[in-house]
Amino acid sequence: MDNRPIGFLDSGVGGLTVVRELMRQLPHEEVIYIGDSARAPYGPRPAEQIRAYTWQLVNFLLTKDVKMIVIACNTATAVVWEEVKEKLDIPVLGVILPGASAAIKSTASGRIGVIGTPMTVSSDIYRQKIEALSPEMQVESLACPKFVPLVESNELHSSLTKKVVYETLQPLAGRVDTLVLGCTHYPLLRPIIQNRMGPDVKLIDSGAECVRDISVLLNYFEINRSREKQELNHQFYTTANAKSFSEIAESWLRLKVNVEHVSL
């Protein structure tokens, strides 16, 4: 048993999609979350900058004595997950490999689409992971640079967002039977994405898939939190406006959250 919290980091609010799934599957675990909304999106930034920012978030979580870190950001996972995993003595998970594995299991045609930030797509990491596991798969990747700013602005249901999503996803329409949401912000746009792609296209939420791996590692290292009834003290931090962050967090998680502003 280990009653310390699990640390989550993201470029902004996107990682909350992973936290929501964790709270559904592992409701007894405690969460500390840091979202770097002041510097979002990470996707267009150079790799060295993403690496530096991610390490700042990692080091912040380490000051909170977390027992595990989840890099709940595809861009940061693509750039620096391997490095962080090797340097820390606690488990560190990323969100890409779980999403790649789930896509392979889902597809019937072998035609998989991946949408993500410019950095995630240019890294080609999803195609590499998918083809390493199943070489016969055909992967089409598409950068969606406008999606994260829309989510960070809480423009989840506007006519502008629908227009942007429909136009951006045009190149993949009718070409794949499985679509990996290769950015943890994207599930917040899931209804619009599903409508654009059609009901027969299976959407893979890479962050939600990651929670299954979290559960496996908690069991493997015997660091599950005690299941005895006790009050959880979830903590949420943002580098941007705490009120804006809490509005999105409370809507998505369906619970009252206290959000603190931090400067890194």
UniProtKB/Swiss-Prot annotation:
Pfam family, one: Asp_Glu_race
Keyword check for Isomerase: yes
Signal peptide location: none
Enzymatic reactions: L-glutamate = D-glutamate
Gene3D superfamilies xrefs: 3.40.50.1860
GO biological process: one example: regulation of cell shape
SUPFAM superfamilies: Aspartate/glutamate racemase
EC number: 5.1.1.3
Record's keyword terms, sorted: Cell shape, Cell wall biogenesis/degradation, Isomerase, Peptidoglycan synthesis
Binding locations of substrate: 10-11, 42-43, 74-75, 184-185
Coiled coil: none
Catalytic residue positions: 73 (proton donor/acceptor), 183 (proton donor/acceptor)
Family per similarity comment: Belongs to the aspartate/glutamate racemases family.
Protein name listed in UniProt: Glutamate racemase
Organism field: Streptococcus sanguinis (strain SK36)
Gene for this chain: murI
